């Protein structure tokens, strides 16, 4: 028994460990350190980071597709809606043009989520961002041609991508 006749405490071992965070949780510092590490380790590290970014883009789109009510029979317009909704979360503004053999998607990115890191690590940031978007597009459209037209790395106000989706 415990104090004053109350029942004593029963302590149990916690299944999950205790997490320490040093320094405080700061995603921008983690991003900065990761970019510095990729920069220092060179091309092989960048290629591995691009693979990770690409797979993350694919997995993100797989989750969005799975949550769609008709995920087994997605039409072009359904896929476009999924891509557009995903794109809007991070500042993409898509425009669609079509012809008889293919449809062209034009993405202009006016609000890069990583613009703070462009000063020191523009090449890395742009390549990782592009591979993420490429992963999302490849998950939705099997036959596509993905082309970067321009990006903020070259002092542009926005990034521009064209995606040709073949029927």
Which residues make up each language-model segment?
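Conserved segment of winged-helix/HTH DNA-binding domains
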Residues: 2-43
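A short beta-turn/loop motif at secondary-structure boundaries
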Residues: 2-5, 99-101, 151-155
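Broad gene-expression machinery/nucleic-acid interaction feature
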Residues: 8-10, 104, 158-160
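Beta-strand residues in well-ordered beta-sheet regions across diverse protein folds
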Residues: 12-14, 108-110, 162
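Short, charged/polar, Gly/Pro-enriched secondary-structure boundary elements
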Residues: 15-22, 114-118, 167
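Mid-protein regulatory/catalytic core that forms ligand/cofactor-binding pockets
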Residues: 36-148
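Coil-to-beta-strand transition motifs
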Residues: 141-144, 154-158
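C-terminal edge-of-domain segments
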Residues: 156-167
């Amino acid at each position: 028994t415990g104090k004053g006749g109350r029942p004593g405490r029963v302590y149990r071992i916690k299944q999950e460990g205790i997490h320490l965070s040093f320094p405080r949780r700061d995603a921008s510092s983690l991003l900065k350190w990761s970019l510095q590490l990729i920069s220092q380790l060179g091309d092989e590290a960048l290629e591995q980071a691009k693979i990770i970014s690409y797979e993350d883009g694919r997995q993100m789109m797989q989750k969005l597709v799975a949550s769609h009510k008709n995920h087994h029979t997605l039409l072009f317009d359904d896929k476009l809606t999924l891509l557009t909704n995903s794109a809007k979360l991070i500042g993409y503004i898509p425009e669609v043009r079509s012809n008889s053999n293919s449809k062209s998607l034009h993405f202009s990115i006016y609000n890069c989520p990583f613009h703070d890191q462009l000063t020191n690590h523009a090449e890395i940031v742009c390549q990782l961002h592009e591979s993420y978007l490429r992963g999302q597009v490849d998950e939705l459209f099997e036959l596509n041609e993905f082309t970067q037209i321009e990006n903020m790395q070259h002092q542009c106000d926005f990034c521009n991508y064209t995606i040709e989706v073949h029927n």
